[in-house]
Amino acid sequence: MVLAAVFVLPAVARTPLQQRLEKLERAIEVTPLESTRFDEKYELVLRQPLDWQAPEKGSFTHRIVVSHAGFDRPTILVTEGYGAKYAYRPDYREELSQLLDANIVFVEHRYFLGSTPDPRDWHYLTAEASACDLHDVRQLLGAIYPGKWIATGISKGGTTTMLYATFFPGDVDGYVPYVGPVNRSREDGRHEKFLRRVGTADERAAVERFQTEVLRRRDRLMPRFEAYCREKGYEFRAPLTEIYDLCALEYAFSFWQWGSNSYEIPATSVTDDELFDYFIGAVDPEYFVRETPTTSFFVQAARELGYYGYDTRPLRKYLSIRNSKDYLRRIFLPDELRDLDFDRTLYRRMHRYLKREDPNIVMIYGANDPWTASGAAWAVTPRKRNMKLFVQPGGSHRTRIATLPEPMREEVIAAIRGWLE
């Protein structure tokens, strides 16, 4: 009889990676997650200070999703601008991770979803604080993943990638911001001009014709609009007539942002039901509701990230509002922040860094995306050897490496692989 060979094992053995994550400074919880793309995937919850300059002011719990390709593989630091919900999907794999067979360290942005402090003190929602969060995660996880690191993000996440580079230059080996704006004010002003030039004259005319038709039929469509908002339980900070106007104005930006096709725009001869269904499908009034999971973004936009305005002049005859000035503050900001001033310090700092320095950055934009109007393409000049710009012809806010024309795509991949050598 071999008695010594009998062992009692735990139901699930903790892997070396899980054990190392659990030993990280300020790690609160490490939870295995299901993945069809990685052998190991975990939710890591860290405790981080609200104010990195004064940790005694309190802390919050910060969610990070770690997807493991190998200790010897490069690591992609995803500088998410919003919540991490989609990163929890079993099939999630970020584009660069797929291309480079790399680990993913996905950082949910502070004040979004599971990384929202309680109480929600808006004072600590700043770009610099979010950059410090990323720097801290980079330092902690760098002990586990000692290879090359690349930071990347999409849209607001792309902006976050660039501001991370601004505050912590050299923290990683390269940066890949996708479709990220660098806005200079609450209503930047460049987007309206962009929308007057984007696409063809026929496409722009089709967009404006639809906006006009929606406004002309206001009396017939408003009962449907009211019923829809009531059924959904939407609450707004402005009268419903103004929300209707804003939806009509938003349509042009949304149309180009998401790469819609002009042949899908209904003719002016369609029924009220057909017109309304397309309208709601294109611009759901949920975007303008009082409180959403993206409220924190609008606080940031109003404080220092900036946003876009609307050109009301072509539609003035049909609008119920005189203009849309200051709509960001009136429609989106919580009541306690209605007097919040915009601070251009962040814009100036990012502009100065991107203009003067030449870090390893690959910027990716879509030519037809309105956010490209306030992007950082201007920072890439012939004298710079490391900063590179790629603009997809006809591309939208959905532009990715995979959507680029093949020669452009190959050049992007070669540049990024060069950082890993």
Write out the residue ranges for each language-model feature:
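Catalytic-loop region of hydrolases
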Residues: 12-102, 406-407, 414, 418-421
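Conserved alpha/beta-hydrolase
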Residues: 97-114
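Alpha/beta-hydrolase active-site loop
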Residues: 124-143
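Alpha/beta-hydrolase fold nucleophile elbow
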Residues: 145-155
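Short glycine-enriched nucleophile-adjacent loop
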Residues: 158-170, 175
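A catalytic-pocket lid/entrance helix-loop region that shapes and gates access to the active site
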Residues: 171-232
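Alpha/beta-hydrolase fold active-site neighborhood
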Residues: 228-342
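Short beta-strand/loop motif that positions the catalytic acidic residue
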Residues: 363-365
